[in-house]
């Protein structure tokens, strides 16, 4: 089974933490590859995999667009239509309903909560 990882973890810099040294792997957003780093053994963040295979399974380059789309705040856009939509709120860590105006905005919009959760959780 694939490891369940917060999809946004792949886009933060690795954090070594303050404790003892352990060899780990992190996903480098710039190179879209998994790289070795020395982890302190405590604290740190979720961009931290015990093996290169675990890192690769959690942070595939093809997930970049979807993950970055979910980081943007849902935008209503300048038009005046009344279209209830769902967007992912990365601060709350959940999908929220908002009113889309029908034009512009961004790609963080889904017709159902289920579609939003499937893309962004």
UniProtKB/Swiss-Prot annotation:
SMART domains: KU
Pfam family, one: Kunitz_BPTI
Localization, UniProt: Secreted
This protein's UniProt keywords: Disulfide bond, Glycoprotein, Protease inhibitor, Repeat, Secreted, Serine protease inhibitor
Single GO BP term: envenomation resulting in negative regulation of voltage-gated potassium channel activity in another organism
Site (Reactive bond): 20-21, 80-81
GO terms for MF: serine-type endopeptidase inhibitor activity
Name by which UniProt lists this protein: Kunitz-type serine protease inhibitor A
């Amino acid at each position: 089974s694939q490891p369940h990882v917060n999809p946004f973890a792949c886009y933060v810099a690795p954090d070594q933490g303050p404790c003892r040294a352990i060899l780990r792997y992190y996903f480098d957003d710039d190179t879209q590859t998994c790289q070795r780093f020395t982890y302190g053994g405590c604290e740190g963040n979720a961009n931290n995999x015990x093996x290169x295979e675990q890192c690769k399974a959690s942070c595939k380059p093809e997930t970049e667009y979807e993950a970055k789309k979910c980081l943007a705040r849902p935008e209503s856009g300048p038009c005046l239509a009344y279209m209830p939509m769902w967007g992912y709120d990365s601060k709350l860590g959940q999908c929220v309903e908002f009113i889309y105006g029908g034009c512009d905005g961004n790609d963080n919009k889904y017709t159902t909560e289920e579609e939003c959760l499937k893309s962004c959780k």
